[in-house]
Structures are given as structure tokens and as C-alpha cells.
A protein has these predicted regions:
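N-terminal glycine-rich FAD/FM-binding segment characteristic of electron-transfer flavoproteins
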Residues: 1-289
Length: 289
């Protein structure tokens, strides 16, 4: 059966490079001051979506993301790997959203897309580590949900079969579509970008990303697929009071970059004297014994 699949993806700050300018005065993350990457677990989710597309002829995969205009890069990265389209939720009213406001915005976007069979995203984003958005989207849409997915085994007869990680093992679950699925980072890694698709979608942008003096501006009329969908709060019939800072009961107080300092090291030999000295030291410090 053909499937309409939406991948929830996020452009996140590279948490390996957090500096002193990481926070704004309002207590939100200053994303403009940090290098941006495709959230790693969302790439795992994208791979599962692309495999479903291959297994079910006629299926489509779209990338849904929320952020400033530069977040369109996430959609391009998805197109380079085999996605068919994308939607960027971008509006100042979306800015500063916590998980509650984010899930509300994404849910309104999914409703506007319409007739979605599977919504799939990473278990959590590396800039928040809450793992809340996927389940909240499912709750807002009233859909079945499965978390900690390792693999979508098959979709047939209107049902999806999914293998998920649990404490001490794995379990296999099955339920009728539509589903909201969150995928672990331990799932299959995403395929690399396809050179032909990079060439095809190199200039794919949303309208807010474009500059009037671009030499390839005429391409957007000749090749409509290069225009990414760009939606505001009004476009998705959203309630401004439930979006961005206005709809966020929580906000980040601070972000700190903690660097673990190396401690003094000792080099020991296999001599009885060194081993005896080490054992006495460990006993004295109550590390063993």
C-alpha cells in the first residue's frame, strides 16, 4: 500500500560547541550563535521512513520542521537523501517554544498536510533531551504512538508492525494506521546524500531564504519543486497564544559548557610492589573493600 509519511526533523545547535553566547537575555537558546546540525536521531527516523517508501511503491516522504528560515537546510538535507517534499513552519510567533508549544505547532502543520499515515521522528533532540515532542504530537492528534522504536518491520493491510526497545530486551507491537513513531539513535543510521539529488535540489529554498539578486532566481519558475513550503501561524490556523513563548510554560534558565579536567595519572608496572601499593591506596580511599 502507498503511504503518506511525515518525518519530524529539527535543526539543533551542535552541543559540542556551546560558548558564552549560547543564551539570550530572555532565557532562550541563542541558536544564531551556535553551529547548526540535523538532529541525529531524526536522521535515524528519516532512514526508517525512506525504507518504508522503498518497500511500499507510490509512497511519499516529507520533512516537517519548525524554525527560522535557515532551518530550510534540514529539508534540503532530507531531499538529498530521498525525501520528496518538505514544510517549514517559520514565524516569529513560533520563536522560543518549549515542547508543549512545539508539539502544538507541529500538530497543526500535520493537520494542514492532511491524510498522513505515519508520523515519525527521533526519540529526542540533543538540545533538550526531553523525548516529549513525539508523544505530545500523538496526544494532540489523537493517534496511536510507539516510542523507542528500533525498526519498522512492515506495513500491510492497514497495520504497522514495529520492533521497539524495552528494559531488558525488545518487543514487537502491531496496530492500525495512522501511527506516531519515535526512533532511537541505536536504529539503523541514515544513508548518505545522493549526488544526483544534491544536484537536483541544491537551490531548493523557502521564499524567506531567497535574495533578489540571486543569479539562479529564474529557476524557481521553471522548476516549481525548488520552492519549499513555508507556513506561518496563520497559514496553519494556529492559535498565537499556544505558540512560541506565549504558549510555553517552561523556558531554559541557562546553558553551561562543562569541560571535565584531566586528573593526575600514574603509570604502574606489573610488579608486586606497584600492585600492592595500588591496592592499599584503593582500600584507604574506600574505592574497594
Amino acid at each position: 500500500m502507498s503511504l503518506k509519511i511525515v518525518v519530524l526533523a529539527k535543526q539543533v545547535p551542535d552541543t559540542r560547541n556551546v560558548g558564552k553566547d549560547a543564551m539570550t537575555a530572555e532565557g532562550t537558546v541563542n541558536r544564531a550563535a551556535l553551529p547548526a546540525i540535523f538532529n541525529p536521531e531524526d536522521l535515524n527516523a528519516l532512514e526508517q521512513a525512506l525504507r518504508l517508501k522503498e518497500q511500499n511503491p507510490g509512497s511519499t516522504v516529507g520533512i516537517l520542521t519548525m524554525g527560522p528560515p535557515r532551518a530550510g537546510e534540514i529539508i534540503r538535507q532530507g531531499l538529498y537523501r530521498g525525501a520528496d517534499t518538505g514544510w517549514l513552519l517559520t514565524d516569529r510567533l513560533f520563536a522560543g517554544a518549549d515542547t508543549l508549544a512545539t508539539s502544538y505547532a507541529l500538530a497543526t502543520g500535520i493537520q494542514k498536510i492532511g491524510d498522513v499515515d505515519i508520523v515519525i521522528g527521533g526519540r529526542q533532540a540533543i538540545d533538550g533531551d526531553t523525548a516529549q515532542v513525539g508523544p505530545q504530537v500523538a496526544q494532540k492528534l489523537g493517534l496511536n504512538q510507539v516510542t523507542y522504536a528500533e525498526e519498522i518491520l512492515k506495513v500491510e493491510d492497514g497495520k504497522a508492525t514495529i520492533r521497539r526497545l524495552i528494559d531488558g530486551g525488545v518487543e514487537t507491537v502491531e496496530a492500525p494506521l495512522p501511527w506516531v513513531i519515535t526512533v532511537n539513535g541505536s536504529a539503523a543510521p541514515c544513508r548518505p546524500c545522493n549526488v544526483k539529488l544534491v544536484m537536483k535540489y541544491k537551490y531548493a529554498t523557502c521564499p524567506m531564504e531567497r535574495k533578489s539578486d540571486e543569479p539562479w532566481a529564474n529557476l524557481y519558475e521553471e522548476r516549481p519543486y525548488l520552492t519549499l513550503n513555508q507556513w506561518s501561524v496563520a497559514d496553519v490556523d494556529g492559535d498565537p497564544a499556544q505558540c512560541g513563548l506565549s504558549g510555553s510554560p517552561t523556558k531554559v534558565k541557562a546553558v553551561k559548557n562543562i569541560v571535565f579536567q584531566a586528573k593526575e595519572s600514574k603509570t604502574l608496572t606489573s610488579s608486586d610492589e606497584d600492585i600492592d601499593g595500588l591496592m592499599k591506596e584503593l582500600l584507604n580511599e574506600s574505592i574497594i573493600g
